[in-house]
């Protein structure tokens, strides 16, 4: 949506009967008002900040996946990688809104270290929480104020995904803290991620009898189809 200021310009001709009137439409690009172009707007800067944040999250989650594998958490590693790919999709959607050139931004980004998997899950959850509770709602509000309703809607939709990311990370962290990654209080079905073997019991086997992969490859059997 583009907003305009309307000015009426009168010009009296040589003949007293000849009065010409022009309606001059001028884009109203003042900060806080509806913008005619993304360039130079607060939303342009916010889109760039969000793009940078999503891009960095993608890399962090890839690093965290490698750490999870080192600790034997194959499923958690796969979830980090899946989420990294989802952050890439967010970044690409935001990047496509930009109109070229250079955009100068001032922003703070996480400069954390790669910790153990429990620490990484909690750090990732905190980042997702900030995005869906603070950053994206504020950026969407500004975008809507400036007339960029499509960008606002996309940011609000991304926030929905980030909320789910946080929940999953917190659930996985809780499983580690409670010793429930490979052990439950009741008999459940465990699936080997490598070959598909199914084991029923309170705890995943030390090694898969079908493919000989270690316990870290087992996950709870779930059917979402």
Locate the predicted segments by residue.
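Short hydrophobic alpha-helical segments enriched in small aliphatic residues
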Residues: 5-11, 24
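Cysteine-cluster motifs in flexible loop/terminal segments that predominantly coordinate metals
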Residues: 8, 18, 203-205
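Non-heme di-metal
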Residues: 31-225
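Intrinsically disordered, low-complexity sequence elements enriched in Ser/Thr/Gly/Pro
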Residues: 10, 15, 54-58
């Amino acid at each position: 949506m583009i907003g305009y200021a309307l000015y009426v310009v009168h010009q009296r001709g040589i003949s007293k009967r000849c009065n010409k009137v022009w309606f001059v439409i001028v884009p109203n690009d003042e900060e806080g008002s509806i913008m005619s172009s993304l360039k130079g707007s607060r939303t342009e800067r916010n889109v760039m900040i969000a793009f940078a944040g999503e891009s960095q999250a993608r890399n962090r989650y890839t690093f965290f996946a490698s750490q999870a594998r080192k600790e034997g958490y194959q499923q958690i590693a796969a979830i980090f990688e899946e989420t990294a790919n989802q952050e890439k999709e967010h970044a690409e959607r935001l990047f496509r809104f930009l109109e070229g050139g250079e955009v100068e931004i001032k922003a703070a980004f996480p400069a954390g270290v790669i910790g153990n998997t429990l620490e990484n899950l909690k750090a990732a959850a905190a980042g997702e929480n900030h995005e869906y509770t603070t950053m994206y709602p504020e950026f969407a509000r500004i975008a809507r104020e400036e007339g960029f309703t499509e960008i606002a809607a996309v940011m609000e939709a991304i926030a929905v995904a980030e909320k789910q990311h946080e929940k999953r990370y917190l659930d996985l962290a809780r499983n580690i803290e409670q010793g429930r990654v490979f052990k439950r209080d009741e008999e459940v079905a465990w699936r080997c991620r490598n070959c598909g073997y199914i084991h029923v019991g309170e705890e995943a086997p030390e090694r898969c009898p079908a493919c000989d992969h270690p316990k870290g490859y087992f996950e709870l059997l779930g059917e979402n189809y």
